[in-house]
A protein has these predicted regions:
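Coil-to-beta-strand transition motifs
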Residues: 16-18, 26-31
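Charged alpha-helix within mobile-element recombinases
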Residues: 75-82, 86-144
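Mobile genetic element proteins and their domesticated derivatives, centered on retroelements
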Residues: 8, 23, 29, 48, ...
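Active-site beta-loop-alpha junctions of metal-dependent nucleic acid enzymes
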Residues: 13-16, 33-55
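Catalytic phosphate/metal-binding cores of nucleic-acid and nucleotide-processing enzymes, i.e., regions
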Residues: 27, 47, 116, 120
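Mobile-element integrase/transposase regions
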Residues: 1-20
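Acidic/histidine-rich, metal-coordinating catalytic segments
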Residues: 55-70, 86
């Protein structure tokens, strides 16, 4: 179903500074990316509250990172699923999209801008996918 998302964070450097919060819709492959100040549960929840103003999310699947420990503050607990430890394939769509982000922001990138994040999000959402019959996620949503 549309609205079932996988969530993750993409760290730019080992320093405890800003990172990317990524959400990927399982069906449409639509990607939402937000630059957050740190990898804390507070920053993640604050970003999610902003995202929920513009997007409908039915369920969310996360890994067991501490940044996702307070998702129940934002979502109904029945809508939250946690992947098994060390089982990244349970959130494969999100992991593949994170690899696409790395094309533009390789590991060790010191700093990025909101403009660059918006560019990457737009590029991913307009990239044709074989699993969508060569439609982009944006085209798929328009046809849904």
């Amino acid at each position: 179903n549309l609205g079932d998302y996988e969530i993750d964070t993409v760290i730019q450097t080992r320093a405890k500074n800003e990172c990317l919060l990524t959400l990927t819709d399982r069906k449409s492959r639509f990607q939402i990316i937000r630059l957050i100040p740190d990898k804390s549960a507070t920053s993640v929840n604050q970003a999610l509250k902003g995202i929920l103003q513009n997007y409908h999310i039915n369920s969310i699947t996360a890994d067991n990172g501490t940044e996702f420990s307070r998702l129940a503050d934002v979502f109904d607990p029945e809508c939250i699923y946690y992947a098994h430890p060390y089982a990244s394939w349970e959130r494969g769509t999100n992991e593949n999209h994170n690899r696409l982000i790395r094309r533009w922001l390789p590991k060790g990138t010191k700093k990025t801008t909101i403009r660059m994040v918006a560019f990457i999000e737009n590029w991913i959402n307009n990239y044709p996918k074989k699993c969508l019959n060569y439609l982009s996620p944006r085209q798929f949503l328009l046809n849904a």
